[in-house]
Amino acid sequence: MSILTVKNLSHSFGGRQILKDVNFRLLKGEHIGLVGPNGEGKSTFLNLVTGKLEAEEGNIEWAKRVRIGYLDQHSIIGADMTVRDVLKSAFSYLFEVESELNDIYMKMGELSDQELDDIMLDAAELQELLETNDFYMIDSKIDEIAHNMGIKEWLDRPAFDLSGGQRSKILLAKLLLEKPDILLLDEPTNYLDEEHINWLRRYLQNYENAFILISHDISFLNSVINLIYHVENCEVNRYVGDYDEFLRLKELKQRQIEAAYKKQQQEIQELEDFVQRNKARVATRNMAMSRQKKLDKMEKIELVREKPKPEFYFETAPSTSRLIFETENLVIGYDKPISKPLNLRMERGDRIAIVGANGLGKTTLVNTILGNIKAISGSISFGQNLAIGYFKQEEHYDNNNTPIDEMWEKFPSWEQFKIRTALAKCSLTTVHIESQMKVLSGGEQAKVRLCKILNEKTNILMLDEPTNHLDPESKEELKRALKEYKGGIFLISHEKDFYTDIATEIWNMEDFSLL
């Protein structure tokens, strides 16, 4: 059974073609991974099929009465809702049924016997709907999912006051409670710690309905999907199997195209040579015209221009003193403490990975060390000659700056050619670097922020989830560059596959936190 059918879908943005003549079909029970480089249109595709964006051309048809659950990168939570309110909203349609049922009960005393018989049938149907959907177990369902997602202690807190990562976990929990006919998940693991990624992995492995998943976490992707749709060069192509099988088939397909292109180019050369040599001679003119017609009708094979590959290299400043920083009975938090007194020390050459569940204070610790947040108590002492490069987990762009503008603000003495070259080394095309930051994808924005740090002379890197939104190729290049970096590294990451080869020491925030 087809749940979603897409025919001849085309869409552009700001004069740039994103998707062209795309055809797509989703069948019941399919577990699809939607993959491709940053900025190629994966999130745009989901926004089009859900109606958040209106397609310029093409047809999108959903099966009747299908319920869609969509977790995107920019979901919004109401300002006055507690976490429990957000999770309860997953059952809003059942609360509407309950309200309708209560209205029926209120009317019963005013009805004739015949009207009462009719309305009792309606009431029985509504009551059955509530019981079938476990309406009277909603609170226990909320408690169960909150426990599994590690958010139980937040249930009565205002959702708007939580961090971006915490809110993402809440929205994911709400989506799973809704149990839609299809899940659309846009990078759901970005803000999940290892424990809850594993829980989500098991959940999706056993999920009976269909889902479409965008993820740059390849080990996670491979463990839950059975089909790949690859988005690149305005096309969406289908591959059966996991991500590793997709890479093998894609490479095989590319070699076949290149071989066919080479063969066709040779044929074209031979035909053109024949036409040139024989079109003027009366005896061979007809044969030359025949060859020319063949050339004119030939469907030319075009090799797709290869996208620029990322080339990351961190500029370095002279070495620091032996001590980088040391804390004495440091307590971090905002209005109240969230950590035990911390006595931490980082020295030259240390490469420290900060791990642990969301909401324990990893980002707060980094911001306190950097002086962006005042400590509750305790002190921090620093070494000499520190040149720190800081990568924030998220950045919001309210102005009309392009990537070129962002780089110029950081490096005002640079010529435009140098700026464009630096951005190109982060695999950003001319279209990307001339677009406004606020319209770029999360991955493209991350590459611009990374480009600033790459070209800043540093001897300490403080990186808060730098792999969020990065495509696999960029992630691997970043890992390589960090392994070669000569300075100290203070890295927050939830991706064990990423930080294991980089870190010389691992600090688990659960050992430090009061939460």
Annotate each language-model stretch with its function.
Residues 249-301:
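Intracellular alpha-helical coupling/juxtamembrane segments of multi-pass membrane proteins
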Residues 312-314:
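Post-kinase regulatory C-tail/linker adjacent to protein kinase catalytic domains
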Residues 1-259, 308, 317-515:
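ABC ATP-binding cassette signature C-motif
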